[in-house]
C-alpha cells in the first residue's frame, strides 16, 4: 500500500513511498522464539468479548493471543492463549467468572515463527510441524496468519519440549525457501 505525501502549498508536488519486497532478501523465517508457562482458556464465544474488554481496560492485561474457535455440541467456543500462566492462576476465579463452561489448560508452551511474507513459502507449516513431530513432540495447536506473517505452535510444557521444538525448526530451516 503506497503512502502519498502532498505539498499543502503546491498539491501538484507529491512524493510516493512504496515498499517493494525483494525476493532475495534472506530467509523468510526471521525469528523463532519459545515461551514456557502458558495457558489456554476455552470460553463460550458469546462471553469472550466482555472478558477481553475487561482484561484490557480494567486489568490492563494484554499478553494473550486469540486462537481459532471451535464448535462442540452446537456451542461455539473461543480459545485464548495466555502467555503468562502464573497471571491466569492468580486471576483464575476472575477469568472463569465470565462463563460457567469456561476451562483453563495449564502447562502449555508456545513456539512462534516470525518472518517476512511467510505466506509465500511453500509448505512452511507442514515442514516445521513434521520436524517437530519427528523430534518426539505432540503439537496441540498451530495457528498461522497470513496478515501477521506469524506461525504459533503450541506444545505441552514439560521437560525440555520448547527447546526440542526450537532445535527441530532450526534443523529444518535450510529446507524452507520462498516459492
Question: Where does each model-flagged region fall?
Answer:
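C-terminal catalytic "cap/lid" subdomain
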Residues: 1-179
Amino acid at each position: 500500500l503506497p503512502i502519498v505525501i502532498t505539498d499543502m502549498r503546491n498539491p501538484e508536488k507529491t512524493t510516493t513511498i512504496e515498499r517493494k519486497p525483494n525476493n532475495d532478501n534472506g530467509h523468510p523465517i526471521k525469528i523463532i522464539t519459545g515461551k514456557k508457562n502458558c495457558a489456554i482458556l476455552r470460553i463460550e464465544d458469546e462471553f469472550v468479548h466482555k472478558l477481553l474488554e475487561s482484561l484490557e481496560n480494567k486489568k490492563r492485561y494484554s499478553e494473550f493471543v486469540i486462537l481459532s474457535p471451535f464448535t462442540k455440541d452446537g456451542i461455539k467456543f473461543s480459545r485464548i492463549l495466555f502467555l503468562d500462566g502464573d497471571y491466569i492462576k492468580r486471576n483464575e476465579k476472575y477469568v472463569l467468572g465470565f462463563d460457567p463452561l469456561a476451562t483453563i489448560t495449564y502447562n502449555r508452551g508456545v513456539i512462534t515463527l516470525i518472518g517476512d511474507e511467510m505466506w509465500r513459502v511453500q509448505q512452511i507449516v507442514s515442514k516445521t510441524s513434521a520436524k517437530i513431530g519427528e523430534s518426539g513432540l505432540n503439537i496441540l495447536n498451530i495457528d498461522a496468519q497470513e496478515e501477521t506473517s506469524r506461525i504459533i505452535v503450541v506444545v505441552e510444557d514439560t521437560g525440555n519440549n520448547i527447546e526440542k521444538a526450537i532445535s527441530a525448526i532450526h534443523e529444518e530451516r535450510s529446507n524452507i525457501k520462498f516459492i
